[in-house]
């Protein structure tokens, strides 16, 4: 029954600076990045690694991640930025793609590690636990904004948005934002526990890619937001990429295990 479902009255726009709107999503993106920075620097200290290499990695990861996240969002949401010049400035504070940010960061870091001759697997394992921590916090912004919303449902834990510029109003929906949040939190906890006894350099990175792509592909089944591309009216691009990623991860995992043994 509807009375048992969660009513979500959100605050998407926190305040404005002139014509620039500061969105709650942008604030939680910032908080997520700050948490990732603190987590990564703490891990650097624990491993007694080079601080300045860590700073290079952080700056590259954040800049490439933000660029990738923004480009992916704009690519799939061009109509959102055709109202006038002020919407270009609002790009800074709203509209991001988690998958785009992940791909942008990974690509930039692979190039950096090869150029510097660093052990990419080792450094990625140092960095990777901070990524799902950031994503967990960022998903709070998704929930407040109403983006990444789910399909209609009458399950007891459905949520109903009463104020949103993105999600349908007055309709009980799957809380897919909360699904993502919980999944990312579990991934973070697993990596945090596993990092002290990983079997080989790169295991944490491969585990993250595996679990992230699986949770994203599964939760995509329950999502209804339009910011996704469908292939053959059957699967989303994320599900296709996720399937390929799982195959690649399994191959790399077996290869790394043979190298260690």
Language-model segments: which ranges?
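Active-site beta-strand/loop microenvironment that shapes enzyme catalytic pockets
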Residues: 65-67, 71, 122-155, 161, ...
């Amino acid at each position: 029954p509807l009375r048992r479902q969660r009513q979500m009255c959100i605050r998407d726009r926190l305040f404005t600076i002139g014509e620039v709107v500061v969105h709650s999503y942008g604030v939680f993106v910032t908080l997520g990045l700050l948490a990732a920075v603190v987590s990564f620097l703490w891990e650097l200290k624990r491993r007694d690694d080079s601080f300045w290499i860590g700073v290079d990695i952080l700056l590259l990861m954040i800049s490439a991640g933000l660029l990738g996240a923004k480009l992916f969002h704009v690519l799939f949401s061009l109509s959102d930025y055709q109202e006038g010049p002020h919407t270009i400035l609002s790009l800074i504070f709203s509209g991001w793609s988690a998958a785009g940010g992940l791909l942008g960061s990974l690509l930039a870091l692979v190039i950096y590690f090869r150029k510097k001759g660093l052990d990419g697997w080792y450094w990625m394992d140092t960095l990777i636990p901070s990524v799902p921590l950031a994503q967990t916090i960022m998903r709070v912004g998704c929930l407040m904004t109403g983006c990444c919303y789910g399909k209609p449902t009458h399950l007891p834990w459905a949520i109903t948005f009463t104020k949103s510029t993105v999600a349908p109003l007055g309709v009980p929906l799957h809380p897919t934002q909360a699904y993502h949040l919980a999944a990312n939190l579990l991934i973070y906890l697993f990596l945090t526990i596993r990092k002290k006894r990983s079997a080989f350099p790169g295991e944490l990175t491969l585990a993250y890619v595996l679990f992230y792509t699986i949770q994203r592909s599964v939760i995509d089944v329950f999502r209804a937001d339009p910011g996704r591309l469908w292939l053959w009216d059957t699967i989303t691009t994320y599900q296709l990429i996720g399937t390929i990623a799982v195959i690649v991860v399994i191959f790399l995992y077996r290869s790394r295990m043979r190298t260690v043994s």
